[in-house]
């Protein structure tokens, strides 16, 4: 069997070569001629998978090592007998930690305590749910908005977007991109919503670029709107507005989910789905793939406060690195994709063992996602 894998999918060659002949291919653009004789195609979010790409091909299975699937026309795949599997939740932890790192950076810069803020989370799926849990573990009040879950009667105190815009100090977006229908999220944050924000609010988009009307956001900022903005995703990509980038507080190249652990989860999830599809199911232990982190252990001599938490978080990942890289490169054609293709290795907080001086700090850090223990207990 011939299996095409995105050249930037970690561990793909190593894993899929167990089950067939592997050929690494570019994700954007992916020339149709490379599909000749292929049985399976493994992609990332940069590849548009639809009739234009696959009509008349021999591909029987498509795997996307991503949580989102708006780049895949799964309706067409199903109608044409092509199996499809994605990797829901694979990068959720990475996105949560990106948001946390960004907020701690703004808190230090602007002189506030994150615990004193109310965070409105729009979209309570794999990312939003985990973010809610970690924020609460740090003592942050959260407000939740998720109309589909509210209408289904899911457990949770769900509020309207209007309520979050009114009452939350920070609004962070974690929805799928729906272009139409009752739960449309395309331009969910538009000029009307932006005008409703009180001065000093923080807006974060780390889901899909068009969930925020980028033109309306740029206009609002140009007109002096006092809004701190964190954008990891843009409208459009890769050709983002450099004028908008110049006005946001943190801007990155759609890399919020790009931890080594998140990428490895995505690859292993689609590998396991493919192995099931061909009748030779295999399970992969993530730990068997990952290397030792650059920083494996640190010892604390004081209880954890917000300043110390920021130092721990930024020891593992400091968002300012990626912000600086995008600002330096954004004016050059092709650099957005190059930053993603050659992304520097980044780990999750769980890769860092924190030896604490007290039980309360260890419990708190474990709840936040670190690997923590009390001195002498391990």
Curated annotation (Swiss-Prot):
GO MF terms held by the record: 4-phosphoerythronate dehydrogenase activity; NAD binding; protein dimerization activity
InterPro entries referenced in this protein's UniProt entry, alphabetically: D-isomer_2_OHA_DH_cat_dom (IPR006139), D-isomer_DH_CS (IPR029753), D-isomer_DH_CS1 (IPR029752), D-isomer_DH_NAD-bd (IPR006140), Erythronate-4-P_DHase (IPR020921), Erythronate-4-P_DHase_dimer (IPR024531), NAD(P)-bd_dom_sf (IPR036291), PdxB_dimer_sf (IPR038251)
Binding-site positions, NAD(+): 146, 175, 232, 257
Domain of life: Bacteria
EC code: 1.1.1.290
Localization in the cell: Cytoplasm
PROSITE patterns: D_2_HYDROXYACID_DH_1, D_2_HYDROXYACID_DH_3
SUPFAM superfamilies according to UniProt: Formate/glycerate dehydrogenase catalytic domain-like, NAD(P)-binding Rossmann-fold domains
GO CC annotations, alphabetized: cytosol
Coiled-coil residue windows: none
Cited PANTHER family: FORMATE DEHYDROGENASE 1 (PTHR42938:SF9)
Function per UniProt: Catalyzes the oxidation of erythronate-4-phosphate to 3-hydroxy-2-oxo-4-phosphonooxybutanoate.
Name of the protein in its database record: Erythronate-4-phosphate dehydrogenase
Organism: Pectobacterium atrosepticum (strain SCRI 1043 / ATCC BAA-672) (Erwinia carotovora subsp. atroseptica)
Gene: pdxB
